[in-house]
Regions:
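C-terminal motif of bacterial Sec signal peptides marking the signal peptidase cleavage site
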Residues: 18-21
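Contiguous, structured surface segment used for ligand recognition
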Residues: 23-165
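Residue-level preference for nonpolar/small residues embedded in alpha-helices
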Residues: 70-71, 183, 251, 376
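Feature activates predominantly on carbohydrate-active enzymes
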Residues: 105-332
Length: 392
């Protein structure tokens, strides 16, 4: 072979060698049978799968920050699952590409269509959220490989999916047991993996107040700590270990942002007017008896609740909710309302005076004290609605 011919062929030969080096000889095919089960999976069983290698590119629409972030998520998932590093770009590419797109005419904003061929993967969502759920399907469909020396492949076919329910929630109770921010982020990642779109954050309980309220610092100075925790209900055995912890407002906002990046809305819950012993231990004047109260170490339903006849208590709850709504942009604000015994209200002069002031009468199925709670919750609903939010 003469030198001129060799010089002409050399670049092409180098490109072939380089491309071949990018593609491992062996492949392991993933599985589209994922949870939650998609609405429809149609496999092209006799078709070559799509092989993911180091030259694979994830393509997202230019100038779309949410899609860029989603593309980065997918690249991370592929690296974690297979050991292969792929590229992310906003430049068009027609082959060996995973192409992300939005089509608002699909009919289901959170739905998506995933089309896998040997040449490319086209993922189209009804919105950015739909695309995100689509990459989670790819995530779950990937084979688990060790070091990237064996190539991952996605089976050829089409997946069509959309959620059956608009609200898909998961609750974490940090009032009874505190969990650090790092753990909550892990749980949010698991929620995202399973297409959950609401994180219900139960922040307060008889056993602990877990969110910083700047106007009422004792809520966390006192209310976030308890002496011990019951570990055997029958014998009333306690572990003897102090339990404490709370989230600063900045940490709560960090969780809100982390969840939002994964298309999850954080719904805060401040349990009112029952399950508030931790608040009463912090501010005894908010209770019917004036205390003293102690952050509880056992679990159940307890008689001491916020005094609904005390105007100071109502102002306290509104102040708390105002700060909560400043932290959490969620449309929904959860205020509990459950398991509020009325024994203290029945004997409380302030509660009875408020009942008389409101002209509340006993009804066949509703005591005066039950109706007092209705009044109390209605006042809080007005406060929430005034901020353009909805009460749960």
């Amino acid at each position: 072979m003469n030198k001129k011919l060799l010089s002409r062929l050399a670049p092409g030969l180098f490109a072939v060698v380089l491309f071949t080096a990018c593609r491992p000889a062996a492949t392991v095919k993933g599985n589209l049978d994922v949870i939650p089960q998609p609405q429809e999976i149609v496999l092209a069983r006799d078709t070559t799968p799509f092989i993911i290698d180091r030259s694979t590119t994830i393509v997202y629409p230019a100038t779309n920050e949410k899609m860029h972030r989603t593309a980065d998520f997918l690249a991370t998932f592929i690296k974690e699952m297979t050991g292969t590093e792929v590229r992310v770009s906003d430049k068009e590419k027609s082959s060996n590409a995973i192409i992300l797109a939005v089509d608002s005419t699909m009919g289901h904003p959170e739905g998506y269509k995933l089309q896998i061929t040997p040449e490319k993967v086209l993922l189209t969502g009804g919105s950015e959220a739909g695309v995100f759920y689509g990459i989670q399907t790819i995530h779950k469909a990937l084979p688990i490989l060790k070091d990237g020396k064996v190539a991952a492949a996605l089976p050829a076919g089409t997946v069509t999916d959309f959620p059956r329910f608009r609200y898909r929630g998961f609750m974490i109770d940090v009032g009874r047991h505190f969990f650090p921010v790092s753990y909550l982020k892990q749980m949010i990642d698991l929620m995202a993996l399973h297409n959950i779109n609401y994180f219900h954050w139960h922040l307060t309980e008889d056993q602990g107040w877990r969110i910083e309220i700047k106007k009422y610092p004792k809520l966390t100075e006192i209310g976030s700590k308890r002496d011990s925790t019951i570990i055997d209900w029958e014998t009333k055995k306690f572990d003897g270990k102090p339990h404490s912890g709370f989230y600063t407002q900045d940490e709560a906002r960090e969780i809100v942002r982390y969840a939002a990046d994964r298309f999850i809305t954080v719904v805060p819950e401040i349990d009112l007017p029952g399950h508030t012993t931790a608040a009463l231990a912090s501010y005894p004047e908010l209770g019917c008896t004036g205390g003293p109260y102690k952050v509880l170490c056992s679990f159940g339903v307890f008689p001491d609740v916020l005094c609904a006849g005390n105007d100071q208590t109502l102002q306290f709850t509104k102040d708390v909710l105002d700060e909560i709504m400043d932290i959490f942009p969620s449309e929904y604000i959860h205020i509990g309302g459950d398991e509020c015994p009325k024994s203290r209200w029945e004997k409380c002069p302030k509660c009875q005076a408020k009942i008389k002031e409101l002209g509340i009468k006993t009804l066949p199925k509703h005591s005066k004290e039950n109706q007092l709670q209705t009044y109390f919750m209605s006042e809080l609903e007005k406060e929430i609605n005034a901020h353009g939010r909805r009460m749960l």
